[in-house]
Amino acid sequence: NINVLVLDFYEVTFMDSSGIGFVLGRYRIVSSFGGNVEVVNLSQRLYSMMKLAGLEKLVTLKTK
């Protein structure tokens, strides 16, 4: 069983809407199995972008 999928964004310096779509797609898959998604090591800029997109309501967001 999948409990938590951790996406490490440590080396990610740029992301557009396709990145948001990637995270949402993984959320849909993992949540269908009862799991959660964590996005970790986000820069402040990427954290703000994901929060603006409303992802903090679906996944756990953690900054560097």
What are these regions (language model features)?
Residues 2-58:
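Amphipathic alpha-helical interaction surfaces in cytosolic regulatory modules
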Residues 60-64:
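Short acidic-hydrophobic, aromatic-tinged amphipathic segments that line or gate anion-handling sites
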